[in-house]
Amino acid sequence: MEKLYFDDTTYIWKTKLNLVEYKKLLLKEAIDVIESQPEVKSDGFGYKQEWKENLNFLGEIIINNKLDEVVKRGINCCKEIYKEKNIEYNKINTDAWVNLVRSNNPVQIQFKHDEMRGVDKYHTHTEINKKNKSFFPHYTYVYYIQMPDVMEGEDGVLYFRGENKKEYWIRPEEDDIIVMEGWMPHAPNNAPKSTIDRVVLAGNVGFEFIKKEKSLL
């Protein structure tokens, strides 16, 4: 993976998964996930959340469809990056979701009202998981299934906020997978003139070492 630096302490990793030929299938599977959860009024639609319940889960999954393949490869990207830390682990915690930024009537609050643009647009997955009493995510990956077809200025970009409070951005392309530290403040921008929505599959990955209790037998 390519490591892209915005400054000395602000960086992401990026590569291609070479799944462009499967875009229609990936999009169909993602839409199926969205349509299966009509009660969800936010922009995130949970996918295979049961993985985080498996104590012995080490990133090996049975691939039943293309979304599963993306999840598997997203986990592998995070494992590759974490390997550089040379820290032992025996459990991987993970979750995944389909994220939708609508070109028309987006549900994110910063797009609903002009006066809210730029206000509290950032989020971090360490904070989200803490509030949800879930695992600590070392990394978050995002795979871009579909990007807007009309983008002007900073439409469609992904914003990052560094430790120096400076704002940076990158405009992802379809088939990009981006990995960031779980604590990285980030925010997607919409593209109001686009005729199609931004659709991604994203996930958190956390590494843990669980001490095994010795049996008295």
Sequence positions of predicted segments:
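Catalytic core of non-heme Fe(II) oxygenases with the double-stranded beta-helix
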Residues: I87-N190, I196-V200, N204, E208-K214
